């Protein structure tokens, strides 16, 4: 997937699930299933319920995403 094809949107973590999966509520009110990107996992950045995050989504599957940034 080319970098130009991704959709970046901000959201809030609503629920923590097993295997580093999270339910994220986007700014537009939709809820998606998101996983943690490799760099966040490698640097041991903790993501908790209530955190604001940036999510990358593919235009082909708008129900799943990848968390790429956690706001302080």
From Swiss-Prot:
Subcellular location, principal: cytoplasm
Keywords per UniProt: Cytoplasm, Initiation factor, Protein biosynthesis, RNA-binding, rRNA-binding
GO molecular function (one): translation initiation factor activity
Domain (S1-like): residue spans on this chain: 1-72
SUPFAM superfamilies: Nucleic acid-binding proteins
One GO cellular component term: cytosol
Self-association state and partner proteins as the record states: Component of the 30S ribosomal translation pre-initiation complex which assembles on the 30S ribosome in the order IF-2 and IF-3, IF-1 and N-formylmethionyl-tRNA(fMet); mRNA recruitment can occur at any time during PIC assembly.
Record function comment: One of the essential components for the initiation of protein synthesis. Stabilizes the binding of IF-2 and IF-3 on the 30S subunit to which N-formylmethionyl-tRNA(fMet) subsequently binds. Helps modulate mRNA selection, yielding the 30S pre-initiation complex (PIC). Upon addition of the 50S ribosomal subunit IF-1, IF-2 and IF-3 are released leaving the mature 70S translation initiation complex.
Name this protein carries in UniProt: Translation initiation factor IF-1
Species this protein is from: Streptococcus pyogenes serotype M1
Gene from which the chain derives: infA
